[in-house]
Design a protein with these regions (language model features):
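Short, conserved glycine- and acidic-residue-centered signature motifs
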Residues: 13, 59, 117-121, 154, ...
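Structural beta-alpha unit
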Residues: 49-54, 68-103, 215-250
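Gly/Ser-rich helix-loop-strand patches that form or flank binding pockets
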Residues: 92-140, 240-285
């Protein structure tokens, strides 16, 4: 397995490697540090002044620290890469050069607004065709939540994650959320028999989605500790569940916008990514 570890030297970015190391074995890790000097005044000439060397030294220090941490986690150091310019462009360009299996990112986000998905993380996820592991804080890496909705994307996420990560001895949950039919327009909720029928079909669909994912997870030798069907707003129910159960990692699927070669994160995925403090693995395959 080959991993691209994107780091700016911050504690949050290092948390991504720390947390991911609990799920990956014998992986080759390429640390990447992108020095974004776009914030400097246009009057500053990086080539003719001492700034360039200073920032190169910063990048080298960040990469040397990452190298040390890779060794501490028992992983294999690949290439140390430094780049200058837009962080997003630097990451995406490197992803095109090498066939990676996983991208690691720490997300600073907007903590004051309780939104954890930073602009760099968001753009990388939207443009990535490989799984992206987003980390916000150091976790215990014990409780894993698979979110399923019956779509090919959520099932494929479960399949790919179990092949990519070592989930042995982890506490595994599977959750599916059915929306409350009583929240439909008033004229549609007047017929109780119709509402009961809709609720029954939703439960059948959710049960099928959970059983499909569970069958695969157990097939690869893992144990599902709990499977839950909830009713309500899917994003909020997942967020609440993650907080209540102190989940360490959420596994979610995303689908490709084939016309633009980008991933389409639905409103549920987007809200979960922005509001949980657990790690999130977004799988696009």
């Amino acid at each position: 397995m080959r991993i691209l570890f994107c780091t700016d030297g911050s504690e949050i970015s290092m948390n991504a490697l720390h947390n991911a190391s609990e799920f990956i074995k014998d992986a080759v890790v390429d640390p990447l540090c992108v020095i974004d000097w776009g914030f400097l005044p246009s009057s500053v000439n990086m080539e003719s002044e001492s700034y360039s060397k200073t920032y190169e030294n910063i990048a080298d220090s960040v990469l040397n620290f990452a190298e040390k941490m890779v060794a501490e986690k028992g992983l294999i150091l690949g290439d140390k890469i430094k780049s200058f310019g837009s962080a997003v462009e630097g990451i995406l360009e490197q992803m095109e050069k090498v066939e990676y299996d996983l991208v690691l990112l720490g997300s600073h986000g907007k903590k004051g607004l309780q939104k954890w998905l930073g602009s760099v993380s968001r753009q990388v996820i939207s443009n990535s065709q490989i799984p992206v592991f987003i980390s916000k804080k150091r976790t215990k890496a014990k409780k894993i939540l698979f979110t399923v909705d019956g779509s090919d994307q959520s099932y494929n996420a479960a399949k790919h994650a179990t092949g990519l990560l070592d989930l042995n001895e982890k506490e595994i949950f599977i959750i599916s959320v059915k929306e409350n039919p009583e929240l439909l327009p008033m004229e549609a909720t007047l017929d109780q028999n119709w509402l009961d029928s809709i609720e029954k079909q939703q439960r059948i669909h959710a049960t099928k989605a959970i059983n499909q994912a569970k069958a695969h997870i157990e097939k690869v030798g893992l144990t599902v500790n709990n499977e839950i069907i909830l009713t309500g707003n899917p994003a909020q129910k997942i967020i609440d569940f993650v907080e209540k159960e102190k989940v360490d990692m959420v596994i979610m699927g995303a689908r490709t916008k084939t016309d633009l070669s980008k991933l389409l994160l639905g409103s549920v995925s987007k809200r979960v990514l922005e509001n949980v403090t657990a790690d999130v693995l977004v799988v696009s395959k």
